Amino acid sequence: MDTEYEQVNKPWNELYQETTLGNQLMVNVGMEDPEVPLLPSNFLTKVRVGLSGGYITMRRIRIKIIPLVSRKAGVSGKLYLRDISDTTGRKLHCTESLDLGREIRLTMQHLDFSVSTRSDVPIVFGFEELVSPFLEGRELFSISVRWQFGLSKNCYSLPQSKWKVMYQEDALNVKPSKKKASKTDSSV
């Protein structure tokens, strides 16, 4: 199932976004850094960017995975980024298997990927190799993605950047609130 998309024609230094069917993806080219939820999907998520001349690369990518279930649900999977400019779906990056019952934040400086601004940016974000005792396990978490574009006159390849797990914690644990003691100790 291909994802429909709209053509985006705005100056490169302005913030713009593109909404796709099934997924929502925020493409951030400005200084602001908003978040838009990206629902888990194994379908294609294309990004089309209208820029004039040059090449673009993806940089400063941050992904937050927010569980909607307990860790006891046993939902896990690998986050893949794929180049779908042809039918092979070349793997750009893949994380290790992630426990999707925990909140996870991932960051990457850049993708080893460059594409002409006159074409689509054929990047797929999606979970594969999902493991869950429930058939609906793929829908038991949500993702938000933040990224920016780098613009260059030349096509170049960067050394592969690794995912960094910023932190992984049990997001469903109730954290005790920090309250000041209402009574003071009055010892005579």
Curated annotation (Swiss-Prot):
Pfam families reported for this sequence: TBSV_P22
Localization (cell): Host membrane
Keywords linked to the UniProt accession: Host membrane, Host-virus interaction, Membrane, Phosphoprotein, RNA-binding, Transport, Viral movement protein
Post-translational modification: Phosphorylated.
High-level lineage: Viruses, Riboviria, Orthornavirae, Kitrinoviricota, Tolucaviricetes
Name the UniProt record assigns to this protein: Movement protein
Organism: Tomato bushy stunt virus (strain B8) (TBSV)
Subcellular location, principal: host cell
Oligomeric and partner information: Interacts with host protein HFI22.
GO cellular component: host cell membrane; membrane; viral capsid
Role noted for this protein: Transports viral genome to neighboring plant cells directly through plasmosdesmata, without any budding. The movement protein allows efficient cell to cell propagation, by bypassing the host cell wall barrier.
Family: Belongs to the tombusvirus/aureusvirus movement protein p22 family.
InterPro entries: TBSV_p22 (IPR005332)
Record keyword Phosphoprotein present: yes
